[in-house]
Amino acid sequence: WLLLWAVAALAGLKPLRSAPPRSAARTQAHEIERLRSLAQAGIAVPAVLHVEPGFFVMRHCEGQRLDQLLAAADERALQWWQRGLEMLLAVHLAGQYLGQAFARNFIGQGDRLVALDFEDDPLAAMSLPQAQARDWMAYLHSSARALRALPPALRDTLPGRLRAVLA
């Protein structure tokens, strides 16, 4: 994380900073707080079922990871990608952030996505708008390889889909 921090500082790009490391107890407390805060904001996340010092239990999340769904490189994959855009926008409009908005940290369930993995705290290194910008960079970067595999006719629809979500 030190190398990424240094590169981000030299380039003046705070959203590229990694969250500084913390103790296991602080990491767990942060993840529980994020799960509860996001759920209260109406964002699909696993429910926290039980908390003890040193561990917590959350509801099992059935489904397939978004990065795996995107690997199909077809129209259905594009629909999943667009759902990810829509979810990220909903998170940000609710005044929230994810912290690790990588495609691997979303689970497709039925026709919705569930977000996972909240132990990082980017607000320890940047402002909320910067953390939200970091979410967009993580999501778009982590889905880029799968999107490159799309047939050209589908790939050409990407800018319009992104504009439609952000409009």
Q: Each predicted region: which residue ranges?
A:
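Short Gly/Ser/Thr- and Asp/Glu-enriched loop/turn motifs at secondary-structure junctions
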Residues: 51-53, 101
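Short, charged/polar, Gly/Pro-enriched secondary-structure boundary elements
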Residues: 64-67, 123
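ATP-binding glycine-rich loop module of kinase domains
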Residues: 1-26
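Histidine/lysine/aspartate-rich catalytic loop segments that bind and position anionic ligands
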Residues: 53, 109, 123-127
